[in-house]
């Protein structure tokens, strides 16, 4: 039988076998003992035509709670944000839609400039001097930042706030184990890093301190106070930040952060079951030659025209092999492009307005919950997430909400035993007043 995408005739098979010097398929696999060869018929359905296959896959996909039909209040690192329509158009162009790393600048100026623009916008948002072309996601960016700090300071202890995303902390633990580094968690108090505990833990053995801004609970950390503690012992100050929040919050670079990392998912990258994402990594000029990942620089060609190239390549795996600054090399260029297009389409004022709407709508939701008798756990300033005490298992609440076409918030009890029955609610610019009111009313009815 001829298949549409497997056009191999019997004549093709015969020619291939002759080329490699065997006569039959059995002879090709003669090294595999007869006793372990499968001789029956596979219990699978008959092949389907393309229309039949599309229909079946559509039926399977319809079982998912998709964000076109459900109002999502689930965040915890992956958010339902508006992506300008132009994003999909640009990233679908054949010039970009490839995993090829642009080693040859003479044929890759478009890709290189797109990466350069991404780096530039990340620097503008974070207040840092230099940014790389992307990382896999926020978690790997955080771990890579810690590895840079340990290598630079030659110290073995990493302090990380317990208010940093649990999955990012898990990635950090994996990296640290391989490098024989000690990871110490700093407890949170009232939803933010406990500064008294941090002060007692920072000493001359600490390579870096890592906090999140806004943190996993949505709270805005006091970066100015943390920076003073961190730099007393010449440790590095690493901040993981939601880039959209920086449209409203003071950039970490203004507070003296040495490295700012995070996930660019809020800009043009759909939730898509949790990935793939696009991490970013920004730092100061002092660490430019130690930064992981690709770096694109601007230069001029022999005719004096502006051009773009991969620069400082001696840091990288294809040059230095095991001595490279990182083993991340296949970057997220397509997702970085999506983020770049989204940021460009929104513009500076658009990013600010998008951030403002997140704050405004989240504040409205908080007031509605309190008016309904719910306790909002933490009283400090927050961006677009806050914690609500459900007084009962969050899974039960979310199961009930799902029946009303609502995707509820994140169950904090999965990661924090002290926050059992607490829900992390995310409210983005896409949520309407009616959707927020419906969420609060439905949860009130479940109480």
Curated annotation (Swiss-Prot):
One of its GO terms (biological process) is glycine decarboxylation via glycine cleavage system. Its EC number is 1.4.4.2. Keywords: Oxidoreductase. The keyword Plastid does not apply. Pfam families: GDC-P. It catalyses: N(6)-[(R)-lipoyl]-L-lysyl-[glycine-cleavage complex H protein] + glycine + H(+) = N(6)-[(R)-S(8)-aminomethyldihydrolipoyl]-L-lysyl-[glycine-cleavage complex H protein] + CO2. Gene3D superfamilies: Aspartate Aminotransferase, domain 1, Type I PLP-dependent aspartate aminotransferase-like (Major domain). The keyword DNA damage does not apply. SUPFAM superfamilies: PLP-dependent transferases. GO terms for molecular function: glycine dehydrogenase (decarboxylating) activity. Belongs to the GcvP family. N-terminal subunit subfamily. The glycine cleavage system catalyzes the degradation of glycine. The P protein binds the alpha-amino group of glycine through its pyridoxal phosphate cofactor; CO(2) is released and the remaining methylamine moiety is then transferred to the lipoamide cofactor of the H protein. The glycine cleavage system is composed of four proteins: P, T, L and H. In this organism, the P 'protein' is a heterodimer of two subunits. This is Probable glycine dehydrogenase (decarboxylating) subunit 1. It comes from Bacillus cereus (strain AH187). The gene is gcvPA.
């Amino acid at each position: 039988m001829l298949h549409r995408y497997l056009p191999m005739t019997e004549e093709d098979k015969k020619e291939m076998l002759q080329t490699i010097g065997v006569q039959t398929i059995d002879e090709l696999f003669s090294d595999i003992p007869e006793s372990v060869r499968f001789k029956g018929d596979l219990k699978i359905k008959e092949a389907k035509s393309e229309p039949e296959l599309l229909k079946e896959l559509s039926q399977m996909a319809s079982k998912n709670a998709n964000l076109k039909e459900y109002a999502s209040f689930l965040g915890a690192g992956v958010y339902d944000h508006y992506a300008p329509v132009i994003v999909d158009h640009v990233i679908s162009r054949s010039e970009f839609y490839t995993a090829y790393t642009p080693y040859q600048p003479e044929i890759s100026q478009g890709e290189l400039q797109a990466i350069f623009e991404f780096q530039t916008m990340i620097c503008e948002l974070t207040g840092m001097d230099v940014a790389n072309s992307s990382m896999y996601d926020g978690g790997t960016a955080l771990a890579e930042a810690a590895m840079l700090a340990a290598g630079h300071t030659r110290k073995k202890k990493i302090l990380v706030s317990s208010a940093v995303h649990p999955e990012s902390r898990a990635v950090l633990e994996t990296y640290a184990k391989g490098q024989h580094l000690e990871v110490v968690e700093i407890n949170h108090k009232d939803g933010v890093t406990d500064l008294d505990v941090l002060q007692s833990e920072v000493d001359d053995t600490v390579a870096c301190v890592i906090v999140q801004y806004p943190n996993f609970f949505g709270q805005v950390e006091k970066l100015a106070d943390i920076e003073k503690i961190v730099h007393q012992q010449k440790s590095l100050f690493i901040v993981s930040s939601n880039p959209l929040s920086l449209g409203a919050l003071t950039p970490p670079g203004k507070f003296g952060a040495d490295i700012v990392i995070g996930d660019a998912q809020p800009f043009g990258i759909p939730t898509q079951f949790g990935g793939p994402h696009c991490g970013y990594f920004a730092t100061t000029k002092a660490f430019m030659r130690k930064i992981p990942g690709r770096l694109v620089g601007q230069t001029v060609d022999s005719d004096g025209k502006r051009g773009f190239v991969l620069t400082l390549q001696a840091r990288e795996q294809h040059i230095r092999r095991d001595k490279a600054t990182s083993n991340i090399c296949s970057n997220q260029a397509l997702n970085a492009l999506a983020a770049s297009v989204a940021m460009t389409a929104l513009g500076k004022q658009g990013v600010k307005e998008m951030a403002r709407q997140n704050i405004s709508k989240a504040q409205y939701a908080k007031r509605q919950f309190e008016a309904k008798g719910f306790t909002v756990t933490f009283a400090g300033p927050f961006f677009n997430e806050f914690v609500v005490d459900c007084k009962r298992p969050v899974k039960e609440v979310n199961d009930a909400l799902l029946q009303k076409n609502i995707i509820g918030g994140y169950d904090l009890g999965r990661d924090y035993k002290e926050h059992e029955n607490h829900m992390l609610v995310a409210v983005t610019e896409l949520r309407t007043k009616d959707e927020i009111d419906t969420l609060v009313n439905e949860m009130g009815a479940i109480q």
